[in-house]
A protein has these predicted regions:
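Bacterial N-terminal signal peptides that target proteins for export
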Residues: 2-20, 24-25
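Short, low-complexity N-terminal intrinsically disordered segments enriched in polar/charged residues
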Residues: 18, 30-61
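Extracytoplasmic/periplasmic, Sec-exported soluble proteins
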Residues: 36-40, 57, 61, 113, ...
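Extracytoplasmic/secreted envelope proteins and their assembly/folding machinery
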Residues: 41-48, 66, 78, 138
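Structured segments of extracytoplasmic/periplasmic soluble domains
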Residues: 46, 50-58, 71-76, 80, ...
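An alpha-helix initiation/capping motif
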Residues: 63, 67, 71-72
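Surface-exposed, charged secondary-structure patches
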Residues: 73-131
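Short beta-strand edge/turn micro-motifs at domain boundaries
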Residues: 134-156
Length: 156
């Protein structure tokens, strides 16, 4: 009886350990998903740090990095920009609203706290360190599949 009781206890302990391991795994997965969810402010800042570094390396992010662009920009905006490029080309870079950029735009990026209304957010981004070089951009962001993405950019 003692031997059977020990087997039962050992089996029960294994089941409890397995259950605890599964619960811990679910908790970790849930925490990772929450940690990956970016606010509009974080998404805008991450996008502009990556985008400006790409421009500084003479890359065309829209053409050369479609996967990364799709992480930060809505499908509709990407399609619209490609359509415009195919017709007459873009006369200025849509995301900086300029034909060229200042050196400090790649290193000095400020994101003002967004105004969020449901699945839309208004975010202001400042590029540049000085009043002479600073450019303010007004972004409209849309929650797309749980992620905040840029759907419009204009001068602020």
């Amino acid at each position: 009886m003692t031997k059977g009781h020990l087997l039962f206890s050992s089996r029960t302990l294994r089941m409890l350990a397995l259950g605890a391991l599964i619960a811990f795994g679910q908790l970790c997965i849930g925490s990772a998903a929450l940690a990956q969810e970016r606010s509009p402010e974080q998404a805008a800042g991450q996008f502009y740090r990556w985008y400006m570094q790409s421009l500084a390396m003479s890359q065309d992010p829209l053409q050369q990095s479609p996967v990364q662009m799709s992480e930060y920009v809505t499908k509709g905006l990407i399609s619209e920009l490609k359509r415009r490029m195919g017709r007459k080309g873009l006369h200025a870079d849509f995301f900086i609203q300029a034909q060229d950029f200042m050196d400090d735009w790649t290193t000095d990026i400020k994101v003002i706290r967004p105004k969020v209304q449901g699945n839309f957010a208004s975010v202001v981004v400042g590029l540049g360190a000085t009043p002479e070089t600073r450019r303010w951009l007004a972004l409209t962001m849309t929650r797309d599949g749980g992620e905040w993405k840029i759907s419009m950019v204009r001068l602020a």
